[in-house]
Amino acid sequence: LTPGIDPRATPACVNACIADALHFGDANDPESNVSKMLAGSKTFKMHAELGTDPNFHYVYGDNDSSEANSGDMVKTVNNSADLGVKPWLQQHWDWRAAGNFIGGGTGGGLAVMGALAAALGATPGALQLAAMASVALGLFMVFLETGRPLRAPLNVLFHPQTSWMTREAMIGIVFFPVAFAALWMGSRELAIVAGLLGLAFVFTQGRILTEAKGIPAWRNAAMLPLILSTGLAEGAGLTLAATAVFPIVFGGFQMVSLWAVLALAVLRVAAWMNYRNQLAGNAPEMTLRVLGGVNPAMIVVGHLLPIGLAGAAMAFPVHAPLSAFLAGISVAVTGWAMKYIIVVKASYNQGYAIEKVPARGISGIAAGVQPGWK
């Protein structure tokens, strides 16, 4: 049977297309029907810039077609003709998906702070316990989101060679027994290993987002340093708040936590600003509008305020507990809000972009359109 020629080896949509607008065949065979068509035609692949190498070729003219009217794609916003093709908000990942990134990132950050405490001779037990609880809560959010929750815990382990979700799950499987053993045995060495696993867990979460090629707000390379910095900042923020409330438990770890919050807040605001700069011109208008709307609060409340409060805690020890608590909570809550907004509110998909408008009559090939972008 020859694909594209024999109806029994050809998709029904191609067989049923009375306009002969759809063609199917083996593009790897130079003698196939589609290979011959492609050789004599001008074609493009939709969203080829994503690097996914789709096997759909769009023919917009033959090799002799004029492109006198062709040029760069025209980006349009708020055009009535855009309906149905411009980017729309994805509906597959909701607050439960955001909860996974919140719980996992915060838990990984807490595990890193526990490793730091162990390395400095402090007692990391409370931080390890909180880290395990936070990561477990995040994974439970994923469990709530799965369509077949009884099959998902097993099926997620099947593709370590390609899936960052699989790698996230595998690191989680190792993280829990190591962190529990460190807590049970009081082992500083295992606490440090658990911290490294927590950092790796946050890294996989960042890679999950960057590999979601259909969502411009996620796939940008600047997403990874943002996810890493905010996860660490969230863990440091909660640790700092805990040292203010339970000073006896954390015995002198407050100053280390203050410096960690200061450093990570600076790193995160730099990552946030770089993320927004990288998205400019590389994301739909609605994504940029959502992120731009929360930017002032992210900068002022989420970073300048906690940096100032942490500095005040260092300068005025008498008010250190209150200032440290507020600084830590501000950093953590801002990270949670940031992830929720990126995952749920700013996650507009790519939409559809037509790189070239097919030749009709003598007018030649016109420039393509990219609705919802500017």
Which residues fall in each region the model found?
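Multi-pass alpha-helical membrane architecture of UbiA-family
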Residues: 154, 158, 246, 288-289, ...
